[in-house]
């Protein structure tokens, strides 16, 4: 099952979500962020990010990337795609969603999400580790969080690894 925003890309298919396709390209890059690898690639002069969903916690040690199928509306990548689209329409600073894929197999599924890359961005965690966080950065983070809070948008897993600074 694939859903996508057809305003930028008209021809997304299964192959578009395959990491190996993009890794054959010299300009592709792999970053190990969070629970798994993230693929950065270029297509039609646009820069994208491909994220495959991996489980965390104790269960993730035994079942790396499979989730219980509860229907399309309950799938992680579809939910995130729809939420990002909604937040973009609200004018909030989030990555623009391009496509989401769910591969169902029996009672489980795997999931992938593609967004537009926020170029020249680093996670807040990376900036802290590099000792590049000053008063202006903290103020910008605070203003951004306040903006989300004012619109009653609350991230269920907000941490320094998923706050991007550009």
Residue map of PLM features:
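Conserved alphaE helix
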Residues: 136-144
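Conserved ATP-binding subdomain of kinase catalytic cores across diverse folds
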Residues: 15-122, 146, 150-151
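N-terminal presequences and immediately downstream first alpha-helices
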Residues: 1-17, 41
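Conserved catalytic-core element of eukaryotic-like protein kinases
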Residues: 154
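Alpha-helix N-cap and loop-to-helix initiation/capping positions
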Residues: 72, 132-136
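Hydrophobic residue at the +6 position relative to the catalytic HRD Asp in the kinase catalytic loop
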Residues: 158-165
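AlphaC helix of the protein kinase catalytic domain
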Residues: 123-132
């Amino acid at each position: 099952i694939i859903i996508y925003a057809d305003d930028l890309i008209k021809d997304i298919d299964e192959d578009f979500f395959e990491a190996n396709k993009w890794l054959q390209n010299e300009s592709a890059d792999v970053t190990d962020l969070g629970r798994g690898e993230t693929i950065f690639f270029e297509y039609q002069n646009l820069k994208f990010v491909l994220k495959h969903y991996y489980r965390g916690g104790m269960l993730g040690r035994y079942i790396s990337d499979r989730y219980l199928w509860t229907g399309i509306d309950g799938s992680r990548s579809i939910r995130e795609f729809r939420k990002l689209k909604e937040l973009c329409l609200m004018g909030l600073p989030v990555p623009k969603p391009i496509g989401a894929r769910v591969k169902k197999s029996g009672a489980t599924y795997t999931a992938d999400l593609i967004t537009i890359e926020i170029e020249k961005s680093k996670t807040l965690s990376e900036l802290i580790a590099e000792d590049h966080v000053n008063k202006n950065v903290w103020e910008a983070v605070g203003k951004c969080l306040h903006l989300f809070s004012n619109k009653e948008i609350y991230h269920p897993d907000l941490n320094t690894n998923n706050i991007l600074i550009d």
